[in-house]
Amino acid sequence: GEKAHLIFPVDKFKANTPDGKALIDAYDRLVLLEQQFMGLEKYDRMDPNHVCFSVMYNDSYMYSAANHTGYVASTMNMMCDISQFIQSIWGPAHEVGHSNQTKPGLCWHGMGEVTNNIHSLYVQTSFGNPSRLLDLYNGKTYTIYEKGLSAFFTQRRPHVVKDDKVDELNQLIPFWQLYLYTKAMGNEDFYKDLYELVRTRSDKATPGESQLEFTVLACEAAQLDLTKFFT
């Protein structure tokens, strides 16, 4: 493809991929959506390299490495079937999101499995899927959204604290709310501009300083006073 390179078993392509062009176009779109979300296109920073999606024969389900994203052999039917791929696109988008994480400004300590999911959710919904935050929380009667909002607003739990009551998907909610709110306010470029600020400003020395700097840069990118949101 133009942006993606697939290394999957030939027999899986033969069994699941009647239209190879349509499949690679979907992978290309995944990669492009994440690059656009980060402002790489807006700020003329597009990566000329392809993102490699490769089958792996080990115990890892899916992962992101230095030069590829890997997917266990048991996922190959899904990865080669365009309908299944689009419905399950969270996983590949999550791994590409890891490759795109910008440290430490948007990936300070404790956010390794959180901020990449801003990308996952953006890609998931851009492909027309329902938001994963609307799924029921671990089979309960309430959604991930409801669980997180209860933890942060009713119980007033610190965002950084993760335990059996709050997980990475709950921690994703405030980041996604920033996207939804700024978009509703007419700012389509919030995260594009935020990523550029992170890329061009000096890194902070500690995770705590990085977290505080994020609030400052978010206000700057949104061109709004978001103090109440962060307190």
What positions do the PLM features span?
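Active-site-proximal alpha-helical
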Residues: T143-T231
